[in-house]
């Protein structure tokens, strides 16, 4: 890894106003996907997230609850970090703006700008929203309240929150001084703001009409960072909050090595705070003599059919509910695949369940199940590239190369949905390849053995590549794919990913489906009920309607009565010479003499002596058969198979040997 191959990505720091819903998780997962991708591409990566913990709103809320702000904040900070853990977020640092190092660095930066005359003391009079922690002019208000005389008494901010009139002494930042510089910077760095439409909004709506100076401090509350030279002022939230992206790296501290190493980086934000990040933030950095971020990417909102998520609307989706019922990877996949990053997207339970069934269960899950089954069935679990190709191999390998190339291009442009669509193009093409080559037909002829093995290799290798590309999005799923393909590796670098891996171990036996199919009607109803805050009633049990999961045809009770099941105590057990699968049991099954049974379970019981004294369940009236030329097996030991493992069936110790089962 070269020293300058670094990557720094940040989420906005979240405001601790209660339980985070799926929208906040959306941003954090997107940044995590990008961070994981860059690490797999060999970049020294640093991923920052955290909480914005100062301000009037927090102070008021804590006072209402009879708590200090810190007492109010600490449990919420712990809850957010626990949620990120559930979402498998691989952040490198979690910043809280109440951290001492951050407060000290912000205070130093403020004093520097004050000395440079970029900040001056003045008086502010205007409309302020406590909820938004933002000042508004009358023209910016969505609605204005007036008294009988026509005087303005209040109003509604664009966010829907009420504003109040504020008059107080404040320090201002000379934003207008840097307006021309900022426009020139935009021109010289056309990719600085993404998507492009966000830049046009900033230029036309805020900069060209005249950039107003920005209030930086408040005196009407105390929960903030005091200005060292005038402690009755506390630093206003946006100067405090924006600097977190560099203070977390050690800026203005005794150890700024990470700052020198990683800055500038990429700030990922929601479109509602794009103005603060694309106008105020680069100007503040420029005034401090620091480079602007490499890029500000302002993504869209995750909406419901009836607009933004809101408890009052009964349409809030919490990620914990989805993870608990459908698994983390299904949630991460849906958010990154169903929504074009940068645009608004709509979450619907129907689309969510449909994606799981069609994309994950049908396309990916089915391909893995079929591939593992055929490799075990037709080639004893071995994956071999024989070089005897079919007429479809060249076009398939071409799709692999195109998929890898397109995937990297999409990831570099933050087009996560496009990157996943590329992977599914490969998965779909590989499913088609099975139908084209018909391995079950090739298996009928020994002459086609080499061609069959080559087909199986292509299936396994395409799954490996798909699994590798899915690592940033669905780490656990990738691991399951690698495991079922019998691979020791649980992670693959993406730097030089290409077709042609050498498989060295047998494929494991087919496990449980990685994504079981869902009952659409039932799951959609469940999600909608949870969104409304309800509890799903237990489904009435109707035995006659239960679909039995059977692998063999049903038998009549008369047939079952022909089988005699007994309890047998293990007296002795030893490996059978010349076989690595068989164990030879000497059993007390209530007969006049001990009986002998040979069972192919040696690989599951490397210490076979642990079975001595156990009381097993056996089929006692199975016709004796000769095995290994010199042994007679007088029955069958019953066992259960699960996840590629096997366990003998036992009974309680106080059940006598020879007891009938049934």
From Swiss-Prot:
InterPro entries: Anticodon_Met, Met-tRNA-synth_bsu_C, Met-tRNA_synth, Met-tRNA_synth_2, Methionyl/Leucyl_tRNA_Synth, MetRS_core, NA-bd_OB-fold, Rossmann-like_a/b/a_fold. ATP binds at residue 311. It is an enzyme of class 6 (ligase). GO terms for molecular function: ATP binding; methionine-tRNA ligase activity; tRNA binding. A motif ('KMSKS' region) lies at residues 308-312. Is required not only for elongation of protein synthesis but also for the initiation of all mRNA translation through initiator tRNA(fMet) aminoacylation. Belongs to the class-I aminoacyl-tRNA synthetase family. MetG type 2B subfamily. This is Methionine--tRNA ligase. Keywords: Aminoacyl-tRNA synthetase, ATP-binding, Cytoplasm, Ligase, Nucleotide-binding, Protein biosynthesis, RNA-binding, tRNA-binding. It catalyses: tRNA(Met) + L-methionine + ATP = L-methionyl-tRNA(Met) + AMP + diphosphate. GO terms for biological process: methionyl-tRNA aminoacylation. The keyword Secreted does not apply. It is found in: Cytoplasm. Its EC number is 6.1.1.10.
């Amino acid at each position: 890894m070269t020293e300058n191959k670094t990557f720094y990505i940040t989420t906005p720091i979240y405001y601790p106003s209660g339980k985070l819903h799926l929208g906040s998780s959306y941003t954090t997962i997107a940044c995590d996907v990008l961070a994981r991708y860059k690490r797999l591409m060999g970049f020294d990566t640093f991923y920052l997230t955290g909480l914005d913990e100062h301000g009037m709103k927090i102070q008021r809320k804590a006072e209402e609850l009879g708590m200090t702000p810190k007492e109010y904040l600490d449990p919420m900070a712990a809850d957010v970090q626990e949620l990120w853990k559930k979402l498998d977020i691989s952040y490198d640092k979690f910043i809280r703006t109440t951290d001492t190092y951050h407060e000290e660095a912000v205070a130093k930066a403020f004093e520097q700008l004050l000395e440079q005359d970029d900040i001056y003391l003045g008086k502010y009079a205007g409309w302020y929203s406590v909820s938004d922690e933002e000042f508004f002019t009358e023209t910016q208000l969505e609605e204005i309240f007036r008294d009988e005389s026509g005087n303005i008494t209040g109003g509604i901010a664009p966010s829907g929150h009420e504003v109040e009139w504020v008059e107080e002494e404040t320090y201002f930042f000379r934003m207008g001084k840097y307006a021309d510089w900022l426009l020139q910077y935009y021109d010289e760095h056309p990719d600085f703001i993404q998507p492009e439409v966000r830049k046009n909004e900033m230029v036309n709506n805020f900069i060209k009409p005249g950039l107003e100076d920005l209030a930086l401090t408040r005196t009407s509350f105390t929960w903030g960072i005091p200005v060292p030279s005038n402690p009755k002022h506390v630093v206003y939230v946006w100067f405090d909050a924006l600097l977190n992206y560099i203070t977390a790296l050690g800026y203005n501290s005794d150890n700024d090595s990470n700052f020198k190493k990683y800055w500038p980086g990429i700030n990922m934000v929601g479109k509602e705070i794009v103005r603060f990040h694309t106008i105020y933030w680069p100007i503040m950095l420029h005034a401090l003599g620091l480079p602007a971020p490499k890029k500000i990417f302002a993504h869209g909102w995750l909406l419901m059919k009836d607009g933004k998520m809101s408890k009052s609307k009964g349409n809030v989706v919490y990620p914990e509910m989805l993870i608990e019922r459908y698994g983390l990877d299904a949630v991460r996949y849906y958010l990154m695949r169903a929504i074009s990053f940068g645009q608004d997207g709509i979450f619907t339970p129907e689309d969510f369940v449909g994606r799981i069934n069609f994309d994950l269960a049908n396309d990916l899950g089915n391909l893995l199940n079929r591939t593992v089954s055929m490799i075990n069935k037709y080639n004893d679990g071995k994956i071999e590239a024989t070089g005897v190709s079919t007429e479809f191999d060249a076009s398939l390998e071409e799709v692999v190369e195109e998929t890898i190339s397109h995937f990297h291009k999409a990831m570099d442009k933050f087009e996560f949905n496009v990157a996943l669509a590329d992977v599914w193009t490969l998965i779909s093409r590989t499913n088609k390849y099975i139908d084209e080559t018909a391995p079950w037909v090739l298996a009928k002829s020994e002459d086609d053995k080499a061609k069959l093995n080559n087909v199986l290799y292509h299936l396994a290798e395409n799954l490996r590549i798909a699994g590798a590309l899915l690592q940033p999005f669905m780490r656990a799923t990738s691991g399951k794919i690698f495991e079922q393909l019998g691979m020791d590796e649980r992670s693959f670098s993406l730097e030089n990913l290409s077709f042609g891996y050498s498989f060295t171990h047998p494929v494991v036996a087919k496990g449980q489906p990685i994504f079981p199919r869902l009952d659409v009607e039932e799951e959609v109803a469940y999600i909608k009920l949870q969104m409304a805050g309800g509890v799903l009633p237990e489904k009435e049990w109707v035995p006659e309607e239960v679909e039995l999961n059977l692998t063999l045809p049903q038998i009549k009770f008369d047939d079952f009565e022909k089988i005699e099941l007994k309890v047998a105590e293990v007296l002795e057990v030893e490996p059978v010479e010349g076989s690595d699968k068989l164990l030879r049991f000497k059993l007390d099954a209530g007969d006049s003499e001990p009986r002998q049974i040979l069972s192919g379970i040696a690989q599951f019981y490397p210490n076979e002596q642990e079975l001595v004294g156990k009381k097993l369940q056996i089929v006692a009236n199975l016709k004796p058969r000769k095995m290994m030329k010199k042994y007679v097996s007088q029955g069958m030991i019953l066992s259960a198979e699960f996840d590629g493992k096997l366990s003998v069936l036992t009974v309680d110790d106080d059940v006598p040997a020879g007891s009938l089962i049934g």
